[in-house]
């Protein structure tokens, strides 16, 4: 009997860190202002407002921009000055720095209308003309210039692992609503934009 109790206590102990981590992420994600998020270096160009007043975000779209290392800062600054211009809410530099450029009650212009309908990567019956700027948080990863096939850097991947959890928790977005831009639009044939990062996010969440 004592052995059973000991094993049960040990199992409970093992489960506590994961449970605590989930609780911490959920609590952090619903805050306002400029919270410190472990594992992320965030430059808050636009602080978080009341999440209850945020736009009704249903999806996350991963973009990669043909800009050199260091271009996320400039792109985010331009986005902050003109929130609805073509671009995204969140930018990620090659060193892993995250720039929160736009308040989450505003809608930047991104995607090409979710016009992919060939089911090449996923079932586009669920995305066609639905996973677009009006429903989706955009996250832009800088640095694939001059070689568009260059993958995201290790610091970007590490930041993404934390960031995607925060975005999902803040806006109550399910894991299967994390998409690569190439999955929902016809994009550059030289590479699959956002595909590795979106796939990683879905694998991490299993």
What are these regions (language model features)?
Residues 7-15:
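Bacterial N-terminal signal peptides
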Residues 20-130:
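N-terminal catalytic cores of peptidoglycan-degrading enzymes
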Residues 1-6:
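Bacterial N-terminal signal peptides that target proteins for export
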Residues 7-8, 20, 67, 95, ...:
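Residue-level marker of positions within ordered structural domains that often coincide
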Residues 20-38, 54, 130-138, 142-206:
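Basic/polar, cationic surfaces and motifs that engage anionic cell-wall
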């Amino acid at each position: 009997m004592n052995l059973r109790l000991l094993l049960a206590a040990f199992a409970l102990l093992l489960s506590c860190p994961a449970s605590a981590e989930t609780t911490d992420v959920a609590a952090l994600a619903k805050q306002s202002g400029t919270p410190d998020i472990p594992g992320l270096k965030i430059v808050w160009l636009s602080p978080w407002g009341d999440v209850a007043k945020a736009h009704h975000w249903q999806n996350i779209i991963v973009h990669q921009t043909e800009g050199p290392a260091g271009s996320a800062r400039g792109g985010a600054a331009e986005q902050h000055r003109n929130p609805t211009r073509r671009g995204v809410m969140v930018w990620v530099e090659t060193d892993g720095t995250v720039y929160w450029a736009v308040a989450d009650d505003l809608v930047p212009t991104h995607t090409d209308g979710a016009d992919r309908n060939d089911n090449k990567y996923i079932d586009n019956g669920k995305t066609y003309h639905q996973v677009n700027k009006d429903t989706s948080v955009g996250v832009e990863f800088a640095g694939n210039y001059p070689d568009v096939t260059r993958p995201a850097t290790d610091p970007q991947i590490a930041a993404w692992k934390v960031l995607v959890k925060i975005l999902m928790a803040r806006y109550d977005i399910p894991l299967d609503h994390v998409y690569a831009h190439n999955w929902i639009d016809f994009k550059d044939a030289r590479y699959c934009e956002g595909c590795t990062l979106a796939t990683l996010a879905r694998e991490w969440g299993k």
